[in-house]
Amino acid sequence: MEGKGRITGHTGLLALIGSPVGHSGSPAMYNYSFEKLGLDYAYVAFDIKVEEVKAALDAMRLFHMRGCNVTMPCKTEAAKYMDELSPAARIIGAVNTIVNEDGKLIGHMTDGEGFVGNLRDHGIEIKGKKITVAGGGGAATAILDGAREISIFNIKDDFFERTLETAEKIRKEVPGIVVNVYDIADTAKMTEEIQSSDIFANATIVGMKPM
């Protein structure tokens, strides 16, 4: 890349939007990767509140940004302004990745793709399997990959109703699929579901930081 390590008049712009984003390691990770791969892109983080999402996406088109990642609390709001949604994003009603194709914004929900891909890399297929998920992350991806049944355990908080809505969308998207949502505090039920499952996935934040 000409002018390696420097921003030029041709440098493409990508970003992370959400709030707060000051702690994010994404800019360092992506910019390091771009430099190593010789890609003329720069990645920055913008602190965007929910009420600013539409304006941010309009600016994304205006400045011909190639795309962006979306973090909390903007994922659901951003989905409202997409020109097109991937199947998983449509089911969940939220996006964490947006691609700008000549002004057409395409929203994706990639949570779960790494999980499913890692299983496949280790010779484990999702198709036809029963899966129990703590936290709900990746549920749509697992279903769209052919899982026959999924049990989701979530905390009964503000997001529990949204999980129930997601389960209903999954049933409509994939007729015949079995999807159940339970309170994660019901340890007896969780034990029962795990014992009858082929795969158990922890999609909560527990384990992301040292205890």
Give the residues covered by each predicted segment.
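Short, well-ordered alpha-helix to beta-strand connector turns
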Residues: 95, 147, 197-198
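Rossmann-like adenosine-cofactor binding region
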Residues: 172-211
